Amino acid sequence: MKIAVLLSGGVDSSYSAYNLKEQGHELVGIYLKLHASEKKHDLYIKNAQKACEFLGIPLEVLDFQKDFKSVVYDAFISAYEEGQTPNPCALCNPLMKFGLALDHALKLGCEKIATGHYARIEENDKVSYIREALDKTKDQSYFLYALEHEVIAKLVFPLGDLLKKDIKPLALNAMPFLGTLETYKESQEICFVEKSYIDTLKKHVEVEKEGVVKNLQGKIIGTHKGYMQYTIGKRKGFNIKGALEPHFVVRIDAKKNELVVGKKEDLATHFLKAKNKSLMKDFKSGEYFIKARYRSMPTKAFVSLKDEMIEVELKEPFYGVAKGQALVVYKDDIVLGGGVIV
């Protein structure tokens, strides 16, 4: 089978390509220029070229920087301006890696596209679904919730059945040159954020804009440095007059540049709503597991789909729900779909 492999210049994607080559597939390497400096791209392209030379496969470099800026980066900035906490990875995957890059791979005659994502593919009744990775500590299924089933059927995740701790020694044994590759230290959460998201925002919008902090009764009790510097659940960075106990951000009013704070129990919610992105129209209401944050544990809930809105009633309270984050619905370890929390 002819498969395109997205190569980042790192160990995971290189070892993914190695595994597929060992299985006898015909491969085409693809490096995506989405963001970052030309200096970084030059280094990572050089790394990807070394992997391709080792495997005896061609490498193509695709420049999608303009597309990435318009559909992912600018949306990230806008969401924070609106007082939300966006999830750019969940937007990038369907639009860039498994959108534009997949389209290009198909034009090259490839049947599928592979990446180093930690996730698996499951087929039920001839429909392809995203499934959690074997290594739950590295699972990335949450970020893949918005993919259409027709797209999922064209994906390959060679690392999905492996543990992260095992991959580096396996990769170095198979491809010794990987141990000599230079890399840059990247953000663990958002790939285009080098230091903090606030530093990224400062390049485009006024972040240092002092405002007031109110309690749940509407009384002004302190000040903050600018609403975009806070997310739901944050407990530091603002001044509360005479505070004797911790206060947490429970609401952000972007238009008024105000924060509303309360106690930890005030963060609790039993009900969530999200604008549907990928739950199928014939979705049956019932009890499922949900995630409302990447690092959160799956939580049992009653989930229903009404007029393009996903409604969730939680068995146990969820703390710190932020607008703009992804709400992902699971049946056991299978992703059924999800949406954006409103």
UniProtKB/Swiss-Prot annotation:
It catalyses: S-sulfanyl-L-cysteinyl-[protein] + uridine(34) in tRNA + AH2 + ATP = 2-thiouridine(34) in tRNA + L-cysteinyl-[protein] + A + AMP + diphosphate + H(+). It comes from Helicobacter acinonychis (strain Sheeba). InterPro entries: MnmA-like, MnmA-like_C, MnmA-like_central, MnmA-like_central_sf, Rossmann-like_a/b/a_fold. The active site is at C92 (nucleophile), C191 (cysteine persulfide intermediate). It is found in: Cytoplasm. This is tRNA-specific 2-thiouridylase MnmA. One of its GO terms (biological process) is tRNA wobble position uridine thiolation. Residues 138-140, 293-294 are annotated as: Interaction with tRNA. One of its GO terms (molecular function) is tRNA binding. Disulfide bonds join C92-C191.
